[in-house]
From Swiss-Prot:
Swiss-Prot/TrEMBL keywords: Ribonucleoprotein, Ribosomal protein
GO biological process: translation
Record-stated family: Belongs to the bacterial ribosomal protein bL32 family.
Domain of life where this protein originates: Bacteria
Protein name, per record: Large ribosomal subunit protein bL32
Amino acid sequence: MAVQKSRVTPSRRGQRRSHDALSAKQLSTDPTTGEVHLRHHITADGFYRGKKVIQTKTSAVEED
Protein backbone atom coordinates (compact mmCIF):
# COMPACT_ATOMS: atom_id res chain seq x y z
CA MET A 1 0.00 0.00 0.00
CA ALA A 2 1.27 3.49 -0.85
CA VAL A 3 2.32 5.68 2.07
CA GLN A 4 2.95 9.41 1.78
CA LYS A 5 6.37 10.76 2.71
CA SER A 6 4.96 13.74 4.59
CA ARG A 7 1.62 15.18 5.64
CA VAL A 8 -0.31 17.10 2.97
CA THR A 9 -1.05 20.67 4.06
CA PRO A 10 -4.56 22.12 3.78
CA SER A 11 -3.25 24.53 1.13
CA ARG A 12 -1.86 21.73 -1.03
CA ARG A 13 -5.04 19.70 -0.56
CA GLY A 14 -7.13 22.72 -1.62
CA GLN A 15 -4.98 23.29 -4.70
CA ARG A 16 -5.52 19.68 -5.75
CA ARG A 17 -9.29 19.96 -5.29
CA SER A 18 -9.59 23.34 -7.05
CA HIS A 19 -10.88 21.72 -10.27
CA ASP A 20 -13.49 19.47 -8.59
CA ALA A 21 -16.22 22.10 -8.15
CA LEU A 22 -19.52 21.52 -9.96
CA SER A 23 -20.93 24.18 -12.23
CA ALA A 24 -24.59 25.01 -12.77
CA LYS A 25 -26.24 23.88 -16.00
CA GLN A 26 -26.67 26.63 -18.59
CA LEU A 27 -30.36 27.01 -19.46
CA SER A 28 -31.98 28.85 -22.37
CA THR A 29 -35.51 29.79 -23.31
CA ASP A 30 -36.77 28.93 -26.79
CA PRO A 31 -38.02 32.09 -28.55
CA THR A 32 -40.95 30.31 -30.25
CA THR A 33 -42.38 28.12 -27.50
CA GLY A 34 -40.92 29.84 -24.43
CA GLU A 35 -39.78 26.45 -23.15
CA VAL A 36 -36.67 26.19 -20.97
CA HIS A 37 -34.00 23.78 -22.23
CA LEU A 38 -30.28 23.04 -21.97
CA ARG A 39 -28.01 25.17 -24.16
CA HIS A 40 -27.26 23.61 -27.58
CA HIS A 41 -30.01 20.99 -27.11
CA ILE A 42 -33.48 20.80 -28.64
CA THR A 43 -36.58 21.33 -26.49
CA ALA A 44 -38.97 18.53 -25.57
CA ASP A 45 -41.31 19.83 -28.31
CA GLY A 46 -38.60 19.40 -30.98
CA PHE A 47 -37.66 23.07 -31.46
CA TYR A 48 -34.10 24.40 -31.80
CA ARG A 49 -33.36 28.11 -32.16
CA GLY A 50 -37.01 28.83 -32.90
CA LYS A 51 -37.41 26.24 -35.67
CA LYS A 52 -39.09 22.83 -35.63
CA VAL A 53 -36.27 20.34 -36.28
CA ILE A 54 -37.76 16.98 -35.29
CA GLN A 55 -41.22 15.42 -35.22
CA THR A 56 -42.20 14.42 -31.67
CA LYS A 57 -44.92 12.04 -30.51
CA THR A 58 -46.83 14.79 -28.70
CA SER A 59 -46.88 17.06 -31.77
CA ALA A 60 -48.01 14.15 -33.98
CA VAL A 61 -50.97 13.49 -31.65
CA GLU A 62 -51.94 17.19 -31.60
CA GLU A 63 -51.95 17.40 -35.43
CA ASP A 64 -54.27 14.36 -35.83
